[in-house]
A protein has these predicted regions:
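A glycine-rich phosphate-binding loop feature that marks nucleotide/adenosyl-phosphate handling sites
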Residues: 34-39, 152, 189-192, 235-243, ...
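Glycine-rich anion/phosphate-binding loop at the beta-strand->alpha-helix junction
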Residues: 207-210, 239-331
């Protein structure tokens, strides 16, 4: 292909800025066009190759394609089995199984197309015997399984360990020491995002969270897991919630891979991580609920362009309806449209080399690394959780964002902007859509997930 730009003189960043300033006719360039994000990043009106001193380097571990996942809660094994098989027949490429108790493995996976659809688990209990049963079952199958064991994630959500710190880690050591190449450990960062943390905080906490595992198991288990092929065996799965700040969220996932690669290299393990992404709950609403479709679509787009391995969409009515065929089908079809009709799977790493996103990736990574180092100097992530410092920082960020919403500066269409006074939801609530309080004794203060619109919605429901 011929060079279409060879007949045109190149324009430097300085020349662009001079032209913009002339067009502003006296208005201040910085005050008019440069804005500051919640993360403290000054976003410029344009980005240019002159902004970069070094050539772009590829983000480590980016996938060449991505998978459409369907979430299924296991209550009745036969129903879960039917839902999984039906979802795969209708376009799902992976299944995320959630369970609160042990289940009949053979019933859930009866006639399951193992080679066709990878399996992710989200188990809210921790049993060595049950994990062993699962591993034995899948050892005879040609499939990919992600067990997603996250002891610290459970601690941040519930305020307690499954058993206690020592016993939980001992069980995990035993599982890891079985010398398998399966994906065992996960780092669930969704609670940080849904709790109101900034993107920089999410990245720093994700890194510190992962570092607790790597540091604990460095001398105890990793050598046994890795054997002679140390750079290939261990891979951590990150669960990521994606918010509405489109370009920042693309950069967030890229920065996470970049940061993890740097951390993993220090432990001499594989620099590749696996990322499963899902839309945030924080900006979802009860009223004018169809807008949730628009929100989740752009959030899934951010996850795809950012380089997530798997996307598990959130149904538009997930806040107030129990899982239902219509909502699940629509959420799956959103991803199918992005993949099959919008061709979001035909170009790998589409964001690479885009000046704005590359700049955001670098700035977010730098700021997150600074915060990570501060956490480590303070005794590490677990110590900071124990002292309540992480929880306090997330609260402060959440309160600032809540204030922006309350003042109308952060707009949620149909809720605090262009509301429909005729909209009624009181009789349509199958689920309680607000923060649930469950008084109990905890060893740390749990991180509470809360939506921005909760107070507004509660007031509207009272008036119906």
């Amino acid at each position: 292909m011929s060079d279409l730009f060879k007949d045109f003189d190149s324009v430097s960043a300085k020349e662009w800025k001079q032209k913009i300033q002339a067009d502003l006719k006296g208005a201040d360039y910085n005050e008019t066009l440069v804005w500051q994000s919640r993360e403290g990043i000054h976003v410029k009106p344009f980005y240019h190759p002159d902004d970069f001193e070094e050539a772009f380097t590829p983000i480590p571990g980016q996938p060449t394609t991505w998978h459409i996942a369907q979430h299924i809660f296991i209550d009745d094994e036969a129903i879960a089995n039917n839902l999984a098989i039906d979802a795969i027949e209708r376009g799902a490429e992976a299944i995320v199984f959630e369970a609160e108790n042990e289940f009949d493995i053979y019933k859930v996976f009866k006639k399951y197309p193992f080679e066709k659809a990878p399996i992710y688990f989200n188990l809210t209990f921790f049993s060595k015997d049950f994990i062993t049963k699962l591993k034995q079952f899948f050892s005879e199958k040609k499939t990919t399984v992600f067990y997603n064991i996250d002891l610290i994630g459970n601690l941040t959500r519930s305020g307690n360990w499954f058993h206690n710190l020592k016993e939980d880690h001992k069980i995990l050591e035993n599982i890891l020491s079985e010398n398998s190449s399966e994906a065992i450990i996960s780092v669930d960062t969704t609670g940080y995002q849904n709790g109101g943390a900034t993107i920089v905080q999410q990245l720093a906490y994700a890194l510190a969270h992962a570092n607790e595992y790597l540091n604990h198991f460095d001398n105890v288990t990793l050598s046994a897991v890795e054997g002679s092929n140390s750079q290939q065996s261990l891979e951590i799965t990150f669960k990521v919630a994606v918010g509405s700040n489109y370009f920042f969220e693309i950069a967030k996932i890229r920065a996470l891979r970049k940061l993890y690669a740097a951390l993993a290299s220090e432990y001499k393990i594989s620099e590749t991580c696996h990322i499963i992404a899902m839309p945030s709950k924080r900006n979802k609403t009860l009223y004018d609920y169809n807008v949730n479709l628009l929100r989740t679509t752009t959030e899934c787009m951010s996850a795809i362009l950012g380089g997530a391995d798997t996307i598990c969409n959130l149904p538009y009515d997930a806040l107030y309806h129990k899982s239902n065929e219509f909502g699940e089908r629509i959420s799956r079809n959103q991803l199918l449209v992005l993949k099959e009709e919008s061709y979001f799977d035909t170009v790998s790493n589409a964001a690479d080399g885009t000046y704005y996103i590359e700049s955001l990736t670098d700035e977010l990574a730098e700021k997150a690394l600074e915060l990570f180092k501060t956490i480590e100097k303070g005794g590490g992530f677990l110590q900071q959780l124990k002292e309540g410092k992480v929880q306090q920082k997330i609260k402060e960020s959440a309160e600032k964002e809540q204030q922006l919403y309350n003042e109308g500066k952060l707009k949620l269409l149909g809720t605090n902007y262009h509301t429909n006074p005729e909209d009624r939801m009181k009789d349509d609530l199958d689920l309680y859509p607000f923060v649930k309080t469950k008084p109990r004794k905890t060893i740390i203060e749990p991180i509470i997930e809360k939506r921005l619109a909760e107070q507004t919605e509660q007031e509207r429901l009272k008036q119906e």
